């Protein structure tokens, strides 16, 4: 399977990799979509996403759900994992993290459609949920609910 030409340009999958220090340093990788032209949905869930508050340097935590309808390319999952974990030492507000991740994946993969849902855990007593999508859901695309309940605290 590794001999398949669509995998030959990958530099991270199956290799020892160093954790990127920042999102700017992280390199997403992509492979050809063997079902290009077929409308379907792929979901990635990152329940332990971490970044830093740009003002206080305190950690912020989120549950991210990334739904995308692939176009000609698929995002390679190890590179996505490394990209997402590169935010651990990155200072940015919740909105910046969530929207920039969605836009980068959408542009890089030339996706047909993408939605990212960022469910940020409370800090200072306020949960912040951030949602971005590239446009209207394509007709005929099955998009299940994210399955993430609204934050209820102890209530």
Curated annotation (Swiss-Prot):
Enzyme class, first EC level, given as a word: oxidoreductase
Gene Ontology CC annotations of this record: cytoplasm
Catalytic residues identified in the record: 53 (thioimide intermediate), 60 (proton donor)
This protein's record includes keyword Oxidoreductase: yes
One Pfam entry name: QueF
UniProt: substrate binding residues: 75-77, 94-95
Pathway(s) where this gene product acts: tRNA modification; tRNA-queuosine biosynthesis
Domain of life: Bacteria
Subcellular location: Cytoplasm
SUPFAM superfamilies, alphabetized: Tetrahydrobiopterin biosynthesis enzymes-like
Reaction it catalyzes: 7-aminomethyl-7-carbaguanine + 2 NADP(+) = 7-cyano-7-deazaguanine + 2 NADPH + 3 H(+)
Cited function: Catalyzes the NADPH-dependent reduction of 7-cyano-7-deazaguanine (preQ0) to 7-aminomethyl-7-deazaguanine (preQ1).
Protein name from the UniProt record: NADPH-dependent 7-cyano-7-deazaguanine reductase
Organism expressing this protein natively: Hyphomonas neptunium (strain ATCC 15444)
